Amino acid sequence: MELCRVLLLIFSAAGPALCYEHETRLVDDLFREYSKVVRPVENHRDAVVVTVGLQLIQLINVDEVNQIVTTNVRLKQQWTDINLKWNPDDYGGVKQIRIPSDDIWRPDLVLYNNADGDFAIVKYTKVLLEHTGKITWTPPAIFKSYCEIIVTYFPFDQQNCSMKLGTWTYDGTMVVINPESDRPDLSNFMESGEWVMKDYRGWKHWVYYACCPDTPYLDITYHFLMQRLPLYFIVNVIIPCLLFSFLTGFVFYLPTDSGEKMTLSISVLLSLTVFLLVIVELIPSTSSAVPLIGKYMLFTMVFVIASIIITVIVINTHHRSPSTHTMPPWVRKIFIDTIPNIMFFSTMKRPSRDKPDKKIFAEDIDISEISGKQGPVPVNFYSPLTKNPDVKNAIEGIKYIAETMKSDQESSNAADEWKFVAMVLDHLLLVIFMLVCIIGTLAVFAGRLIELNQQG
């Protein structure tokens, strides 16, 4: 029994040792006269065929200002090296090995539209080498590719970005690159919280440059159509701006007599200014175009400032008096006679339109109270009775009081008319500002939202 255990241990330890010996001998034989600077072809006129596949893992960042898209990818490359073939039976049945990528010839694929200066693919990974000479190399890479970011419809925008891959020194007669598929592999793609992939495709291009008009250079360009998820900007930017606009409209619902109209207007303006300073970093700072959200914020700012200016006019109208302003007939006709009837302002108390009698006293006055006699005693204003100094002074005093009361009544009626005009303006502007707020919001965003809905 003990002998069996000893033999079992010996054979189990010998297995890995034999495998290591076979792989070591295989590697020594393969690379004894191998040169990694020579293309693996039998005839120098032959081309090495390289199959390229792009696997997109993660969309890391989209920099709208610098127009750089950062992605995490795996670049799968397959080709056949005729100098690295072997018979598995000669090496203990070893059919594949993994060797450092620096030890073999590799196609010098680079990202043409790289934006950070590092054009090469990561080298510090191993390749899978099969006994047929087929090599599979899938290095990971962080690509920073240039992409023309169009912010016109931000945050309801779509961006069409690309990655252009090709060999740096080999033309199409020396190395032929073929796409593994017309679409990149997104089987391991991790969804972004800001972007969603709408479409993605790859195309192979034959390019002839001016320096070499007879020699083609090949590249594979992958295009990605990305659509931004706007929920974050709707909740944190658009809805607050909309609420500021509605609050601005309600300034005209506040009674002018309260004295708080300007306080509320200035408070809204200051709050909006602070809010814009906080969120300005969320908006792409580029001068190529004004984004939708920038237009809406500008609309909101103009909306608030316009309300302040109009509020000043309304307050000025409310406090006008006949001693400073005379109401033009057209103002009376429009704001007292016409608009209240059109807008159904039935709850408004209109100013008195009764015209006081121009005569303070008739020529015949009743002086029964003065004479002490019962019943009316018609007395001519110029009768001898009225020539009595005491009576005359009393009548003059009464006339002065009556004229003063008439003047005060006229002033009060005129002031009431101005206040009524201001009240009509408030009601009218409340309706107008609410409509402008809704229509302005729809005018800025509705067209783009309808377009995106039609695109599906």
From Swiss-Prot:
Main location (coarse class): membrane
Disulfide feature: 147-161, 211-212
According to the UniProt entry, its GO molecular function terms are: acetylcholine-gated monoatomic cation-selective channel activity; transmembrane signaling receptor activity
Which reactions appear under catalytic activity for this entry?
K(+)(in) = K(+)(out); Na(+)(in) = Na(+)(out)
Transmembrane segments annotated in the record for this chain: 230-254, 262-280, 296-315, 428-446
Q: Provide the glycosylation site positions.
A: 160
Q: How the protein sits in the membrane? A: Multi-pass membrane protein
- Taken from the record's topology, the Cytoplasmic segments are 316-427
Where does this one sit in the cell?
Postsynaptic cell membrane; Cell membrane
- Which N-terminal stretch is annotated as signal sequence? 1-20
Q: Which SUPFAM superfamilies match?
A: Neurotransmitter-gated ion-channel transmembrane pore (SSF90112), Nicotinic receptor ligand binding domain-like (SSF63712)
Q: Which family does it belong to?
A: Belongs to the ligand-gated ion channel (TC 1.A.9) family. Acetylcholine receptor (TC 1.A.9.1) subfamily. Alpha-1/CHRNA1 sub-subfamily.
Annotated protein name in UniProt? Acetylcholine receptor subunit alpha
Q: Which organism is it from?
A: Gallus gallus
* Gene responsible for this protein: CHRNA1
